[in-house]
Amino acid sequence: MAGEGDQQDAAHNMGNHLPLLPAESEEEDEMEVEDQDSKEAKKPNIINFDTSLPTSHTYLGADMEEFHGRTLHDDDSCQVIPVLPQVMMILIPGQTLPLQLFHPQEVSMVRNLIQKDRTFAVLAYSNVQEREAQFGTTAEIYAYREEQDFGIEIVKVKAIGRQRFKVLELRTQSDGIQQAKVQILPECVLPSTMSAVQLESLNKCQIFPSKPVSREDQCSYKWWQKYQKRKFHCANLTSWPRWLYSLYDAETLMDRIKKQLREWDENLKDDSLPSNPIDFSYRVAACLPIDDVLRIQLLKIGSAIQRLRCELDIMNKCTSLCCKQCQETEITTKNEIFSLSLCGPMAAYVNPHGYVHETLTVYKACNLNLIGRPSTEHSWFPGYAWTVAQCKICASHIGWKFTATKKDMSPQKFWGLTRSALLPTIPDTEDEISPDKVILCL
């Protein structure tokens, strides 16, 4: 049986299918040096990396069997859904979940799912050690592959989050598979903030954009200002100002969040983002580098309006990311985040040992030590070699440093930080005595 150190290596490494390494290479692989490159790191002006590669998860293999269609359960209905026990991740609807499964119990379970509705439950553990979960998300398999490695049957899966649920009951079958009785949570769709005071005779005067309008040039900006003024003109009939209604308007909230997202990806196009407020709010939730406590809070929210308001509040206030173990050692900030994937700056990836890491890409990180030599094996970003990165203070695993294998690639280096190792914090300001007194919109 592998010791605790072996299990940690398996969790942090992307390659090394075999758990044991040759004895003569152990000293080289454990070599520890301070990461100096981050001090001079600058945001890349040009990115020639194919941003579609990370989302395709090519490291799982190209010949996966794909499925079409989707399984959706009725709102408020009660369902009994099997649980994958090794998945320790808070899955967001619409988020992709790659998996590599080795345990015979899980392999058998997935085979049975393929013959049925391909849906399993991912529990949002509020306490992983005690396996406590009140909420979760259904996941549907859309790509599947079986193979054998040294006589061990391996199942590789790509799944996507579908619907939120509340856990009603958990029970374990005789074969060891856990079944969850859940209630599917509905999405509360709120009417327009102006619907209560909008005169039906003036409905024909409203203007609606046929498609998302570019805000890049001044002309588009003027159009947007005019559109907003016309949209909230009925506020003049009430005792409340127009800006108050805009605080709860889905379109306005989405536009404010898009401005933040463009700071992470200057080439971001509106066409690449969901136009539906519900899907958009989940897309943002999946790429926010927040801890499990905040993510579960977002998962509980049943209204896209409230979810968008909370996400905007988090993006504005939680600007520093620290080591979760040290809690005060800053690793990076919101300004250093950039996107190297079509799905945004953060996505879930799985290593050959089956450990799933939600990895945030940043162009600058500090207070890190590098462990071992660079390796291209099983790299989540093809063309880049990875090196394990640890906190310089407490030596806890933070993520990886990625370096380009070719000189013409841009960026030449970046860091991938695992969400589970980061703690979002609110920096002290002169106007605030303590960050604890700052209340997020949850």
From Swiss-Prot:
Pathway in which this enzyme or protein is active: Protein modification; protein ubiquitination
Binding positions ((S)-thalidomide): 378, 380, 386
One GO term describing the cellular component: cytoplasm
Domain of life of the native organism: Eukaryota
Cystine pairs: none
Record domain Lon N-terminal: where: 81-319
Sites where the protein binds Zn(2+): 323, 326, 391, 394
Consequence of changing residue 384 to A: Abolishes thalidomide-binding without affecting DCX protein ligase complex activity
Secretion signal span: none
Keywords from the named record: Cytoplasm, Disease variant, Intellectual disability, Membrane, Metal-binding, Nucleus, Phosphoprotein, Ubl conjugation, Ubl conjugation pathway, Zinc
GO molecular-function term, one example from the UniProt record: metal ion binding
Biased composition (Acidic residues): 24-35
Modified residues (Phosphoserine): 25
InterPro entries: CULT, Lon_prtase_N, Lon_prtase_N_sf, PUA-like_sf, Yippee/Mis18/Cereblon
Keyword rRNA-binding: no
Note: Thalidomide was widely prescribed to pregnant women in the late 1950s as a sedative and as treatment against morning sickness. Thalidomide was found to be teratogenic, causing multiple birth defects. More recently, thalidomide use has increased for the treatment of multiple myeloma and erythema nodosum leprosum, a painful complication of leprosy.
Entry remark concerning the domains of this protein: The CULT domain binds thalidomide and related drugs, such as pomalidomide and lenalidomide. Drug binding leads to a change in substrate specificity of the human DCX (DDB1-CUL4-X-box) E3 protein ligase complex, while no such change is observed in rodents.
Protein family: Belongs to the CRBN family.
Record note on quaternary structure: Interacts with KCNT1. Component of a DCX (DDB1-CUL4-X-box) protein ligase complex, at least composed of CRBN, CUL4A, DDB1 and RBX1. Interacts directly with DDB1. Interacts (in pomalidomide-bound form) with IKZF1 and IKZF3. Interacts with ILF2. Interacts with TRAF6 and ECSIT.
Protein name stated in the entry: Protein cereblon
Source organism per UniProt: Homo sapiens
Name of the gene this protein is made from: CRBN
